[in-house]
Amino acid sequence: MDFRIGQGYDVHQLVPGRPLIIGGVTIPYERGLLGHSDADVLLHAITDALFGAAALGDIGRHFSDTDAAFKGADSRVLLRECAARVKAAGFTIQNVDSTVIAQAPKLAPHIDGMRANIAADLGLPLDRVNVKAKTNEKLGYLGRGDGIEAQAAALLVKEGA
């Protein structure tokens, strides 16, 4: 069997005046993530992991942050399109594991909603999608609350291999 593992990463700055959307869930908070799209750091990391596993480049190659068509884009739409492109390249998504690093707000109450959104968008059973939340123990820019980071891993299998 032809298995492929991809790794994804994203980080966005926290700023006032923007909604905080992580994993397709709008989280009540006084700041949100700055970005060309909705800046969903988790979905961007997962999208990168999927494209990487399929050797299809990265999120910027497919959904450029200089393209006006993606201004304010819903990252769930981008994730669904990514999944379609990965499938068109002959791959089946097996599972996704991810970590969000944020000093605040507390993300635990929102994890189930994030997992449900990701599973729905990728057409996966819920038990094949994992989201973890960590702090940075008040160290560095993440610990100061200047931004939020996400990391993801994805496993694909080549159809017919």
Swiss-Prot record:
Protein's recorded name: 2-C-methyl-D-erythritol 2,4-cyclodiphosphate synthase
GO biological process: isopentenyl diphosphate biosynthetic process, methylerythritol 4-phosphate pathway; terpenoid biosynthetic process
UniProt binding sites for a divalent metal cation: D10, H12, H44
Presence of keyword Calcium: no
EC numbers: 4.6.1.12
Site (Transition state stabilizer): H36, T135
Requisite cofactors: a divalent metal cation
Subunit: Homotrimer.
Catalysed reaction equations from the record: 4-CDP-2-C-methyl-D-erythritol 2-phosphate = 2-C-methyl-D-erythritol 2,4-cyclic diphosphate + CMP
Record keywords: Isoprene biosynthesis, Lyase, Metal-binding
Native source organism of the sequence: Burkholderia ambifaria (strain ATCC BAA-244 / DSM 16087 / CCUG 44356 / LMG 19182 / AMMD) (Burkholderia cepacia (strain AMMD))
Protein family per UniProt: Belongs to the IspF family.
Pfam families: YgbB (PF02542)
Top-level class of the enzyme under EC nomenclature: lyase
Cofactor note: Binds 1 divalent metal cation per subunit.
Function in brief: Involved in the biosynthesis of isopentenyl diphosphate (IPP) and dimethylallyl diphosphate (DMAPP), two major building blocks of isoprenoid compounds. Catalyzes the conversion of 4-diphosphocytidyl-2-C-methyl-D-erythritol 2-phosphate (CDP-ME2P) to 2-C-methyl-D-erythritol 2,4-cyclodiphosphate (ME-CPP) with a corresponding release of cytidine 5-monophosphate (CMP).
Gene it is expressed from: ispF
